[in-house]
Amino acid sequence: MTPTNQSSGTTNASVEVLSEDGPMPINVMMQEGVKALTKILSNQLQDRQAFQNAPHAMQFVIRNGGKALSNARLEELKDALPKMDSLSLEDELAKIDGQSAYHIDSAEEKETFESKIGQIASRNSADFIIEEDLQNILDDDLKDSELNLDGEEAEIIFDYESQELDTPDGIGEKISQMIESVLPGGFGSEEQGGLRTVTNVEDLDVAEEVTDIDHDTVDAARLHGDGKHSISSRKHSRSKNSKKNGHVRRHDFYDESRDHKSCCPHHHYENLSKLRNYYYHDFEYISKTENRVPDFSVLVNESSPMCLFCEYYMVFGEPPRNMIKWYNRTFGYNRMPNPPRDEQDSRKRNR
């Protein structure tokens, strides 16, 4: 890519994508051209702060088989069409590509083509055919609806010269609009992925890789969804079993396999007989201590992890009664493991 400085101070640049292996689908050529143009616009324009100076512009051209006309070529035809008869118009349109790929063969097709030209010219009452009408003629009457580049050396040329680009953020949108304007049906939905819609420069850079990523993303999302469904099913099943057994567990999301025994004294089963009833968390810890000055150094010196209640107990020297009551009111008593059967019988006998 070699920029060319014009006398007016504007800078022109173009990218050519050549097909060395014969005819190629238009979308493949589009993708390669878009990727190349994106690199130019992002690296060249932004690096030299072009958008802080005079506005730049951009043009999209397809040659050797393209159905759409470049902006410059369209302007030429606007001036030339009113001066042509139908035969010279057909010849001029055939020059869009070097192979004369577009032809109006039958007399009926020629008559239809001429009538459309006459209707548009009289309706506009001007010396040229407007761009939308000309493009409609090309779409309706020219052949090769698949829009394949079928020359020996097909090429797509990107040139930012005719449309102003105000900010870097508008690059992707402009490219998307221009490419969509030259495709017969806009951006089609392809089963195999590929170039669909482009909204910004970052999307352009990864347009070709989307096909490879889509399958992995879908598979990962499916696995994630299946995992969530499996967890939800297990929770639902566990909740049904709990209700069937007469227990309503409001916090099945807690890890019940977590070992509370080594955490603090009130988690030990052997001390349950010294407490007044099963809901021992609403009452005092086993050993009573006198109030003392809080000692936060114990948290630094303690190597084993402690629960929030135990941290309070170690620092302040007294059980966090209000914290425990709030916890039990919020999460319920049934989360705590049931004591062994012999401990329950022992407590009943001691009453």
From Swiss-Prot:
One annotated GO biological process: cell division
Comp. bias intervals (Polar residues): 1-14
Protein name: Protein IBD2
GO CC, alphabetical: cytoplasm; spindle pole
Subcellular location: Cytoplasm, Cytoskeleton, Spindle pole
The keyword Cytoplasm belongs to this UniProt entry's keyword annotation: yes
Region Disordered, residue ranges: 1-20, 222-249
Gene for this chain: IBD2
Function text: Part of a checkpoint which monitors spindle integrity and prevents premature exit from mitosis. This cell-cycle arrest depends upon inhibition of the G-protein TEM1 by the BFA1/BUB2 complex.
Domain of life per record: Eukaryota
Family, similarity comment: Belongs to the IBD2 family.
Modified residue annotations for Phosphoserine: S100, S106
Ranges of Basic residues composition bias in the record: 231-249
Phosphothreonine modifications at: T211
InterPro entries for this protein: IBD2
Subunit composition and interactions: Interacts with BFA1.
Keyword field: Cell cycle, Cell division, Cytoplasm, Cytoskeleton, Mitosis, Phosphoprotein
Organism: Saccharomyces cerevisiae (strain YJM789) (Baker's yeast)
